[in-house]
């Protein structure tokens, strides 16, 4: 399982906020929903490591550790915190990003206020090193800017 997925490709929160903070004078973003952003490249690397382990383990023992595993980057932030870091790493200073309550954006779906995933099992089972979300966000934004 994963959460708050973003990358250089397709439509996602990171790319949307890069655009909005570069073009809007003010932006309201919820601060009362917390989770952890997941950089798709980090997730892909973790999956590749697991597949490599799978290949070695099944050849050696005809057995592999199965189950439900959680993966997201390390750390915790709100959507507001995430947006502020996106603007900072993008070099956007003109937009006034303001925190707001989620009830200011009515939704037919109830969103959890805390959706941080416990990654202990995937780290202990496969020895995966998971980068901190700010480190990965900076890499993603650098990649986006270099590929324009």
Task: Place the predicted regions along the sequence by residue.
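NAD(P)-dependent short-chain dehydrogenase/reductase
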Residues: 1-35, 40-49
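A general structural signal for well-ordered alpha-helical segments in protein cores
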Residues: 13-14, 40, 44, 79-83, ...
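Residues that recognize and position ribonucleotide moieties
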Residues: 27, 36, 75, 98, ...
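Residue-level signal for the nucleotide or nucleotide-sugar donor/cofactor binding architecture
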Residues: 35-38, 77, 117, 128-131
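Mid/C-terminal beta-alpha module of Rossmann-like enzyme folds, strongest
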Residues: 46, 53-108
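A hydrophobic C-terminal alpha-helical subdomain
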Residues: 103-123
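Amphipathic terminal alpha-helices
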Residues: 133-148
